[in-house]
Design a protein with these regions (language model features):
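Acidic/polar N-terminal loop/beta-strand segments that form early-domain functional surfaces
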Residues: 37, 50-52, 57-61, 77, ...
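Beta-propeller blade signature
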Residues: 71-79, 133-142, 192-198, 245-255, ...
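Accessory beta-strand-rich segments of carbohydrate-active enzymes
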Residues: 92-96, 178, 186-275, 279-282, ...
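Surface loop/turn signatures of beta-propeller and other carbohydrate-active proteins
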Residues: 2-45, 64-67, 82-111, 143-172, ...
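Hydrophobic core segments of beta-strands in well-ordered, beta-rich domains
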Residues: 43-63, 67, 87, 105-129, ...
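Active-site-proximal structural scaffolding
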Residues: 40, 67-70, 102, 129, ...
């Protein structure tokens, strides 16, 4: 088993190494968003701080810029922004994860007394359709992983006939390990909870949460964590229209396995943010990162874009810190502080636009951060429109609709590939000397 896995890893790594220099020359490569050295990536996996460094694993097809035969890519970072690529961590190699239309699906990572353990969904096909099971792999150095001889460690015994049973997210509470796994019943999304004393022998605990017709048909990539004195269940629902990442906030009783949620919300209001995963770092921060791309089943999708011809596809979002807004009871998401260390040249522009427009020239190939301070006290304008990347091929538009209290991003005429118009509400408070604006809480 170990020898076969090693051969598969070496083959995949050899191919990536043979094309990565060519891929690096692609004019579409990003400057400060994480990308694989080449080929296709999607969901973030195994997001963890281990022995002082941040580790990010990810769904990876090393052989093509299209989805297929999932491996786990791997990178590490000191600051969540600049990443160093490490050898591919997992490859399909065993009877439980060798499906050509599957492989080593999404999962998570935990530190078990210095041993880095990955838990992932293995997919195989027994001739009657795809079967999804949960498996583990271990490493003493955080780089080289061996699959557990007793895999799979969780079988789909509680999913009542369907074949969707994937994306384990593991954590420890007290003396027990817990894992949430996404599934569906009667075309309604749900998350199952299991517990274990050793990450190898698991018992079913409960249906942690489920849809009753209002929250989608399948819940992918669930994550369960504490923020403040509340617990959060985060997942990516299928079949919920333009809502592709959401959260439920409530209270957890581990003695009964019962999660009672009272609030729900979107993790992101844009088009390209899917399957986010969280970690808790040594500063006490809950940080998430998501896949910055879309699936063809999403209503705004039209094409993955020209980067596919350059032998790569996909990137991750900027990492965000998760906080609980005590006033609203909802979550707020803030770019991690580390991104400020990459600011180089500051260019302050004071604009007073009565009508028409004002051009702001940006250097560094569209790689910048732009902070706006808008004086709403003095303006009588009904809207403010910001045009990005305007050229002969199109334009992306950000519109602040002051009158209707909305922030709108429109990329329908941006590049000819992915489309979409997304908006979030603005909550504006004015009180003599103060103006406060909250965007989507």
């Amino acid at each position: 088993m170990a020898d076969n896995h090693k051969v598969k890893l070496e083959q995949a790594q050899k191919y990536v190494d043979s094309i990565k220099d060519e891929v690096a020359l692609s004019k579409y490569r990003q400057g400060y968003h994480f990308m694989a050295p080449a080929s296709w990536i999607n969901d973030p996996n195994g997001f963890i701080q281990y022995k002082g460094k941040y580790h990010l694993f990810y769904q990876y097809n090393p052989y093509d810029s299209k989805w297929a035969s999932m491996h786990w890519g791997h990178a590490e970072s000191e600051d969540l922004i600049k990443w160093n690529h490490l050898p591919i961590a997992l490859a399909p190699s065993e009877f439980y994860d060798d499906d050509d239309d599957g492989g080593c699906f999404s999962g998570s990572a935990v530190d078990d007394n210095g041993v880095l353990i990955l838990m992932y969904t293995g997919t195989t096909n027994n001739g009657e359709g795809t079967v999804q099971v949960q498996c583990i792999a271990t490493s003493n150095d955080g780089v080289n992983f061996e699959k557990f001889e007793g895999n799979p460690v969780i079988l789909p015994n509680f999913i009542e006939g369907n074949r969707d049973f994937r994306d384990p997210k593991v954590w420890k509470e007290g003396d027990l390990w817990y894992v949430v796994i996404g599934t569906t019943k009667n075309n309604e999304g749900r998350v199952l909870l299991y517990s274990s004393p050793d990450l190898r022998e698991w018992e079913f605990v409960s249906v942690l949460a489920e849809s009753h017709g209002e929250l989608g048909s399948m819940w992918e990539c669930p994550d369960f964590f504490r923020v403040g004195d509340k617990h959060v269940l985060m997942f990516s629902p299928i079949g919920l229209g333009t809502t592709i990442t959401m959260y439920l906030i409530g209270d957890m009783d581990y003695s009964t396995g019962k999660f009672t949620w009272t609030e729900k919300g979107k993790v992101d209001s844009g088009c390209d943010f899917y399957a986010p995963q969280s970690l808790l770092d040594d500063k006490g921060r809950r940080i998430i990162i998501g896949w910055a791309n879309s699936w063809p089943w999403m209503e705004w999708f039209s094409d993955f874009g020209p980067n596919m011809e350059d032998k790569w596809n996909g990137a991750m979002s900027l990492p965000r810190e998760v906080k609980l807004d005590e006033k609203t009871g909802k979550l707020k998401f803030i770019p991690v502080e580390e991104i400020k260390n990459y600011r180089k040249e500051e260019n302050k522009v004071e604009l007073r636009i009565l009508n028409g427009s004002k051009d702001i020239k940006i250097s560094h190939r569209n790689r910048y951060e732009m902070l706006f301070n808008i004086d709403l006290k003095s303006t009588t304008a009904k809207e403010l429109i910001i045009k990005l990347r305007e050229n002969k091929n199109g334009v992306a538009i950000i519109k602040l609709d002051i009158e209707n209290k909305q922030l709108i991003f429109d990329r329908n005429n941006c590049d000819g590939y992915n489309k979409g118009i997304k908006s979030c509400d603005l909550d504006l408070f004015e009180d003599t000397l103060s103006v406060n604006i909250f965007s989507d809480n």
